[in-house]
UniProtKB/Swiss-Prot annotation:
Keywords: ATP-binding, Cytoplasm, Kinase, Nucleotide-binding, Pyrimidine biosynthesis, Transferase. The gene is pyrH. It comes from Pseudomonas syringae pv. tomato (strain ATCC BAA-871 / DC3000). UMP binds at G60, D80, T141, G142, N143, P144, F145, F146, T147, T148. ATP binds at K18, L19, S20, G21, G61, R65, T168, Y174, D177. Its main location: cytoplasm. The lineage of its organism: Bacteria, Pseudomonadati, Pseudomonadota, Gammaproteobacteria, Pseudomonadales. Pathway: Pyrimidine metabolism; CTP biosynthesis via de novo pathway; UDP from UMP (UMPK route): step 1/1. Its EC number is 2.7.4.22. GO terms for molecular function: ATP binding; UMP kinase activity. This is Uridylate kinase. One of its GO terms (cellular component) is cytosol.
Length: 247
């Protein structure tokens, strides 16, 4: 059930939450961990309970990785289409978890899947969000050669979100992979150009440039930290904030 907030005023009215497909695996090596789904549904429900409008984009890497097949000769476009279908599967699983928690949710796919999902329509998505329904955007942009990170930034701009929240396994952006380099240092704040100049692997170039060109703030945080998502929405300084340079 969408839980009521603790009285704090939410900093953001509408957010776009980007989850990687790998995040749904939990401790598994493949697929979807139901416990992770339920926990994420609970955290999203907390946001809905304090009046925050939530759009979701989920990757598909827990179900399909096209890189190995592409290296073996598979056509890139075919691989990307398979990846889009994986994101739809994750979106349906998340919708089910939300509905079991009594949170109204809808899946809107960029590729037509009549009888399975709604087709993406910006105006309808905005109406669902305004009605406090969670909208899960599936199938990326509907085009090959674009990542789900790019899709998340594109949808955030289209629905006029206040911020893109990218959930990862680490608590922000580092100078290097903190799992591999113990001396890696965390950034609390970056500009889009600093991310591009330093070649930091936050998102792909297209996604970062989309955010920069449309002045869409981006925060990278650790979804595995309990309460981190709610803290961000209340204005907390979790993870790393990426935005335009202050004048």
């Amino acid at each position: 059930m969408a839980q009521q907030g603790s009285g704090y005023q939410a900093r953001y009215k509408r957010i776009l939450l980007k989850l990687s497909g790998e995040a749904l695996m939990g401790s598994e090596e493949f697929g979807i961990d139901p416990k992770v789904l339920d926990r994420m549904a609970l955290e999203v429900g907390q946001l809905v309970g304090i009046g925050v409008q939530v759009g979701l984009v989920i990757g598909g890497g827990n179900l399909f990785r096209g890189a190995a097949l592409s290296a073996a000769g598979m056509d890139r476009v075919t691989g990307d289409h398979m990846g889009m279908l994986a994101t739809v599967m994750n979106a349906l699983a998340m919708r089910d978890a939300l509905e079991r928690a009594n949170i109204t949710a809808i899946v809107m796919s960029a590729i037509s899947m009549l009888g399975v999902t709604d087709h993406y329509d910006r105006r309808k998505a905005m109406r669902h969000l305004s009605a406090k329904e969670v909208v899960i955007f599936a199938a990326g942009t509907g085009n090959p050669f674009f990542t789900t990170d790019s899709a998340a930034c594109l949808r955030a701009i289209e629905i006029d979100a206040d911020v893109v929240l990218k959930a990862t396994k680490v608590d922000g952006v580092y100078t290097a992979d903190p799992f591999k380099d113990p001396n890696a240092e965390k950034f609390d704040h970056l500009t889009y150009d600093e991310v591009l100049d330093r070649k930091l692997g936050v998102m792909d170039l297209t996604a970062i440039c989309l955010c920069r060109d449309h002045k869409m703030p981006l925060r990278v945080f650790n979804m595995n930290k309990p309460g981190a998502l709610l803290n961000i929405v209340h204005g907390g300084a979790e993870g790393t904030l990426i935005e335009e340079a202050q004048q």
